[in-house]
């Protein structure tokens, strides 16, 4: 349960969680006498299936919110109405605990019995942390603390706060992505130079180039997504599809909970073939945000529905490069004969059960009428259209 929780909240570091948490989870599991591959699966499921949930506002919130606002602006060019990065915050806080509980339960009662006791096949050697590396970690931690204090001072002195010291709509939230970027950059530099990994700026450049080399396909995909979104805005095709779709759904009486569940399942299905959450939302938002607005739903609510469909099947899509990284690590260190089918077949029950329970949780939340974020409900505010 703890590993599942750590994996879920790990998305504050975005995709880094998928790389770091599964190997660490394997070591923890092996340390308590459990099968390390199960630990990798639990850590991976938490980081992937629970990717959209967090106790804090993360970069994912800001990224999706920006795409949602672009869709609103394309639909109503003269509007000042926007959604905030916190528009799904309340719902996602409780979803974090839900994801951890469901993933933990599934791992204990469904995955662990399949693998049984670990017999020690494979090579799993834990390298000892050197004194220099410990100094690097201390330097990174100290840097993070100082940086957070500076940000807090900026907020409470009014530089990063909104009107009347408000958190919602503040420059702190609007600039969350660059703030997190600088935080991780400073921590990385502090560790690198203290631990001796970096000697000069050339070493930093080489490390950045090495990591960005694997992002080439994603950058290329983002380019075509940008062209797609630009063409949609120029031709107004998204608006036409939204109006036609909204009229058709309203005429058929297909609204409310059935519509919400159908949209969640659509996103869940497409996610198996296109694993990037931002890329899918860049395609979906120009169509579905206006469509749901015409049906009377808040754009933040539509974004929430997308996130509910986008997360659980992250764990089972073979299109994600991270599941292949988990497979390679498992084969190298713990189970030489494990295949991709074994991983997916064990992760599939987690994805399905989590999706079902999450949708039920959403329906209860929706029927009660609780806000999904500060000042955000399911209904579109009066006077927007």
Task: Briefly describe each language-model feature range.
Residues 1-26, 31-32, 219-228, 250-290, ...:
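Hydrophobic alpha-helical transmembrane segments of multi-pass integral membrane proteins
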Residues 22-118, 304-308, 323-364, 370, ...:
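Membrane-core helix-loop-helix motifs of multi-pass transport proteins
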């Amino acid at each position: 349960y703890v590993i599942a929780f750590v994996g879920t909240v790990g998305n504050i570091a975005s995709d880094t969680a998928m790389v770091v948490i599964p190997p660490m989870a394997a070591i923890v599991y092996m340390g308590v006498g459990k099968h390390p591959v199960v630990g990798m699966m639990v850590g991976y499921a938490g980081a992937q299936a629970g990717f959209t949930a967090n106790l804090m506002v993360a970069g994912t919130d800001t990224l999706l919110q920006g795409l949602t606002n672009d869709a609103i602006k394309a639909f109503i060019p003269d509007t000042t109405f926007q959604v905030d990065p916190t528009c799904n915050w309340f719902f996602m806080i409780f979803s974090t605990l839900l994801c951890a509980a469901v993933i933990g339960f599934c791992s204990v009662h469904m995955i662990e019995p399949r693998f049984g006791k670990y017999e020690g096949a494979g090579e799993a050697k834990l390298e000892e942390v050197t004194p220099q590396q410990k100094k690097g970690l201390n330097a990174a931690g100290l840097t993070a603390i100082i940086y957070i204090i500076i940000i807090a001072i900026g907020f409470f002195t009014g530089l990063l706060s909104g009107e009347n010291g408000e958190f919602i709509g503040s420059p702190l939230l609007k600039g969350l992505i660059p703030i997190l970027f600088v935080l991780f950059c400073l921590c990385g530099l502090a560790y690198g130079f203290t631990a001796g990994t970096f000697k000069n700026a050339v070493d930093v450049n080489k490390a950045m180039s090495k990591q960005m080399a694997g992002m080439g396909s994603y950058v290329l995909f983002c380019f075509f997504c940008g062209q797609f979104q630009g063409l949609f805005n120029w031709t107004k095709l998204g608006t036409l599809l939204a109006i036609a779709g909204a009229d058709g759904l309203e005429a058929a009486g297909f609204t409310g909970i059935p519509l919400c569940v159908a949209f969640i399942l659509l996103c869940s299905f497409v996610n198996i073939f296109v694993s990037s959450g931002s890329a899918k939302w860049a395609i979906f938002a120009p169509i579905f945000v206006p469509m749901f607005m015409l049906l009377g739903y808040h754009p933040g609510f539509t974004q929430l529905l997308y996130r509910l469909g986008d997360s659980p099947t992250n764990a089972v899509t073979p299109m994600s490069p991270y599941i292949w990284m988990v497979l390679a690590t498992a084969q190298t260190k713990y189970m030489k004969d494990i295949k991709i089918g074994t991983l997916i077949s064990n992760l599939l029950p987690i994805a399905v059960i989590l999706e079902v329970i999450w949708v039920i949780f959403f329906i209860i939340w929706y029927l009660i009428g609780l806000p999904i974020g500060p000042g955000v409900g399911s209904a579109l505010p009066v006077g927007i259209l």
